[in-house]
From Swiss-Prot:
Binding site for substrate: R190
Domain of life from the UniProt record: Eukaryota
UniProt function note: Required for formation of the 2-thio group of the 5-methoxycarbonylmethyl-2-thiouridine modified base in some tRNAs.
Chain positions with Phosphoserine modification: S164
Gene: tum1
Domain Rhodanese intervals: 24-141, 176-292
GO molecular function: 3-mercaptopyruvate sulfurtransferase activity; thiosulfate-cyanide sulfurtransferase activity
Active-site residues, as the UniProt record annotates them: C252
Organism of this sequence: Schizosaccharomyces pombe (strain 972 / ATCC 24843)
Region of interest: Hinge: 142-175
Protein name: Probable 3-mercaptopyruvate sulfurtransferase
Predominant cellular place of this UniProt entry's protein: mitochondrion
Length: 298
């Protein structure tokens, strides 16, 4: 759990990753969290099976999800999360280091998931593949290693990190009283409602009162890593986010790039940040049926 008012260093460079592996390899697990948008022809699991950081396990957000919910990769129940990560050899005290092949795209979603369920020792390793190769280190190929299953105890959903549709409605109905910023991580044209959504049955536009900070404004070119903290501060400040005590809810298409903003905001010391789990995949359907929920244009 994030400590209130305390800056958490959870983004690791290659040297930090290697040090953790050196200090406590038996209690450190690398997780490949590679995932691509449905419109992409690539497959994260297939790429993992072809090559990976040595010893890495694969975290599939389309497997570790709420299977009773038709929306994409919604958070799983706590007991199912515990069962899933236990099979990956992860217990409550494991150092979990998460990366994705793109660099800093889907790994923050898995980072946020671990935080939601109260895992303390979880880190992000941006630009992992390039950093690994630059150090002259080899990737692992062939059959992935099979971890020894363990029991993950004490998983409990932290509601302070998750926003629901009801939370969104409260902000829409009384933004000043709610005192919450809703930040949309989608591309600007989607936010404006100028282009159709790729998923069927979704309205085009945005949540009333929300502001748009495309997640790519917070990442380096190619979405390989987060921008330096100083640059992130400038991005958020330019959009009016200067008071780090004001609550923020991040949203996107299905909760993935909203988690990129979550990580960037936490890196800058924002204290109260939640991810709207269903994001536009759920909200857009509701807005299709109730136009009062929809805003378009700037």
């Amino acid at each position: 759990m994030f400590s209130v008012g305390k800056k958490i260093s959870f983004i690791l460079p290659i040297k930090g990753v290697l040090q953790k592996l050196k200090d406590n390899a038996q209690k450190t697990v690398l997780l490949d969290a590679t995932w691509y948008l449905p419109t992409d022809t690539k497959n994260g699991k297939k790429e993992y099976l072809e090559s990976r950081l040595p010893g890495a396990q694969y975290f599939d957000i389309d497997e570790a999800k709420d299977h009773k919910n038709p929306l994409p990769h919604m958070l799983p129940p706590a007991d199912e999360f515990a069962s899933y990560v236990g099979k990956l050899g992860i217990d409550r005290n494991t150092n979990v280091i998460i990366y994705d092949r793109k660099g800093f795209f889907s790994s923050p979603r898995v980072f946020w998931t671990f935080k939601v369920f109260g895992h303390e020792h979880v880190f992000l390793f941006p630009n992992a593949f390039n950093a690994w190769k630059t150090e002259g280190l080899e990737l692992e190929t062939g059959e992935p290693r099979t971890p020894k299953p363990v029991v993950y105890e004490g998983a409990k959903l932290n509601k302070d990190l998750v926003a629901s549709f009801d939370d969104i409605v409260k902000v829409i109905e009384s933004p000043d009283a709610a005192g919450v910023h809703i930040v949309d991580a989608r591309a600007h044209e989607r936010f404006l409602g100028n282009v159709p959504e790729s998923r069927p049955g979704l309205a085009s536009g945005h949540i009333p009162t929300s502001i748009n900070i495309p997640f790519t404004e917070t990442t380096a070119a190619g979405i390989t890593a987060p921008k330096p903290e100083e640059d992130l501060e400038k991005v958020f400040s330019s959009h009016g986010l200067t008071d780090k005590s004001v609550p923020i809810i991040t949203s996107c298409g299905s909760g993935v790039t909203a988690s990129v903003l979550f990580a960037a905001l936490k890196e800058c010391g924002f204290k109260d940040v939640r991810v709207y789990d269903e994001s536009w995949s759920g909200y857009g359907k509701r807005a299709n049926e109730d136009s009062s929920l929809l805003a378009t244009g700037p």
